[in-house]
Amino acid sequence: METCLTFQSHLSPPPGDGCRSPTEMEHALNYSELLKANDDPERWECPLGFDYASEKHRFQQFTVAFAAALTITPKIETGACIQDASFHSQLIFPVGLARFHSLRFSNFASFITVKDDDDVPSEILSTILVLADRLGYTYIPYNYLDADYTGSITGVTGIDSWWIRYFDYI
């Protein structure tokens, strides 16, 4: 029996019954192709035309909705906290008493992700997916980012995975 990710009732569910299986979600997008298609061979921190002010505003909208939906107060890192990186902001949120995860917001293609998302409770991951859809983000499952980087950027050493390409300090 396949696991069903359900969406909280106070958030707008996706079309249908408000339930998507992980398999259905992964079949909806070809993540490997999406990562390659948005790779910029010349710009490694952000694409041409990246509007930092707009992205920061959208990140703030996500943060407010995320905190309200889950009744938690995530730690916010953005602005001067993040430099020389392929992402612009992150939310650090608790999972249990002593564990934290970070939800990162890439400078490329409105990508977002949580590193090691297999450990994130389904309620939190479902909320992230609903908010991503509502605010125009594309959630990339971490297992696709942990793969070897096969993109077109040259001249920058240390980019050996898609995680580093889109969601890490460079």
Question: Where are these predicted regions, by residue range?
Answer:
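N-terminal, Lys/Arg- and Ser/Thr-rich interaction peptides
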Residues: E2-C46
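Acidic, proline/glycine-rich low-complexity IDRs
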Residues: E2-G18, D119-I170
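Exposed alpha-helical structural elements
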Residues: N30-E33, Q61, T127
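Eukaryotic intrinsically disordered, low-complexity regulatory tracts
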Residues: K36-W44, L48-G49, A65-A69, T73
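A short, highly charged nucleic-acid-interacting micro-segment common to nuclease
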Residues: W44-Q60
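Short cationic amphipathic helices and targeting signals
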Residues: G49-Y52, A109-V120
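Well-ordered, non-membrane alpha-helical segments in soluble/globular domains
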Residues: E55-T63, P121, L125
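Amphipathic, interaction-prone secondary-structure segments
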Residues: Q60-T113
